[in-house]
C-alpha cells in the first residue's frame, strides 16, 4: 500500500515538473537573454528523471518483477528513457543541449497517455503471465524500449532538420519568382538603391544563414549519434528476444505482427545509417528515411498492440 501511494505521488510530481520544463523551455525560445530559465529547465529534467526512477523502483518492489510487463509500464519506462537521453546529452559539455524541445514533450505525452483512463486496468500490478516469467524480460524489453526512445528522438531531430531546410528552399524559391517578375522600368536610380540595400544587409543575411547552417549541422550530427545508439539497443533487443523466444516457444523467429514490424523498423534504420555514412547520399536523404522511421516505430510499438493478436498479445489493450 505504501509503495502504491508513493508511485502515485511520484508520477504526479514528475508529470508536473516536466510540464513546467516545457513551459520554461519555450519561454527561453522567446527570450534568449534569460539564461537562468534555460538552466532551470535542464535541472527540471533531472528532477523528472529521479522521480520516474523512484516510481519504477517502487513498482518493482511491490510487484515483485521488473516493471515492463504491459503497455502502461513500458510507457512509463519510455518516459524514463527520454529523460535519461536528455541527461546524457546535458552532461556532454561540448555542445549546448537543445534536446528539451524533443525530450520534454515526448516525456509528458507518454506519461499523459499512460496515466489516462485508457490504461487504468494495466496500471494495477498483477502476477506475470507464464510467458513473461523469465530473466529475459528485463534484458529484452528494456533494450527495445530504450531503442525506441533513442530512435524517436533522433527521428524528430531529422524532422526538424527537414522543416528548416525546406523552409529555406521555399523562401529562396519565392524570392526568385519575385525577382523574375520585377519591372526594371525605374531606371538606374532604383538599381543603385537596391544595390545599396544589398550591401547594407549582407552582413546580417550572412550571419543569419551561417546560424541556420550551424543549426542544420548540429541537428544532423545529434540525429545521427542518437539514432546510432538506438539502433544498437534495438539490435540487442531483437537478438535477446530471439533467444528468449527459442526458450519459451521453441523457435527463434515466428513472424508474428510484433516481430515483423520490429524487423521492418530495424531495416529502415539500417538503411538510414547506410545512407548517412555515404557522402553522396547523406543529409536530406537520410533525414527523409529517419522521418519515415518515426512513423514505423509507433506502428511497431503502439499500433500492433491494438490488433491484440500474435505471440505478443499479452501486452495489448482495447479502446472500448
UniProtKB/Swiss-Prot annotation:
GO terms for biological process: cytochrome complex assembly. One of its GO terms (molecular function) is heme binding. Its main location: plastid. The keyword Iron-sulfur does not apply. It is found in: Plastid, Chloroplast thylakoid membrane. It is a multi-pass membrane protein. GO terms for cellular component: chloroplast thylakoid membrane; plasma membrane. The chain crosses the membrane at residues 9-29, 44-64, 71-91, 99-119, 144-164, 226-246, 261-281, 287-307. Keywords: Chloroplast, Cytochrome c-type biogenesis, Membrane, Plastid, Thylakoid, Transmembrane, Transmembrane helix. It comes from the Eukaryota. Coiled coil: none annotated. The keyword Membrane applies. May interact with Ccs1. Belongs to the CcmF/CycK/Ccl1/NrfE/CcsA family. Required during biogenesis of c-type cytochromes (cytochrome c6 and cytochrome f) at the step of heme attachment. This is Cytochrome c biogenesis protein CcsA.
